[in-house]
Amino acid sequence: MSDTIRTLQGRVLSDKMDKSITVAIERKVKHPLYGKFIKRTTKIHAHDEQNQCNAGDLVTIRECRPLSKTKSWTLVEVISKA
């Protein structure tokens, strides 16, 4: 295992849960046959201790120990508000 902590940037899709947010991580993947770059989206559940995020915010999250069945990321900062 490496000692670096994984951090990602994404947009908040949902903040309806208590102390939790759903973040959409967008990445570009090259199509194997045609070579065109395609956008792929991954949804990640993250922990938001102060409930400071709203839907549409641009945020930075980092990996942590598992907090629940689906949450293993925590909010680091809100880059821009929606």
Curated annotation (Swiss-Prot):
Gene Ontology MF: a single term: structural constituent of ribosome
Gene Ontology biological process terms in this record: translation
Any one GO cellular component localisation term in the record: cytosolic small ribosomal subunit
Sorted UniProt keywords: Ribonucleoprotein, Ribosomal protein, RNA-binding, rRNA-binding
CDD domains given in the database record: Ribosomal_uS17
SUPFAM superfamilies linked to this entry: Nucleic acid-binding proteins
Assembly, per entry: Part of the 30S ribosomal subunit.
Family: Belongs to the universal ribosomal protein uS17 family.
HAMAP family given in the database record: Ribosomal_uS17_B (MF_01345_B)
Annotated protein name in UniProt: Small ribosomal subunit protein uS17
Organism (species): Shewanella halifaxensis (strain HAW-EB4)
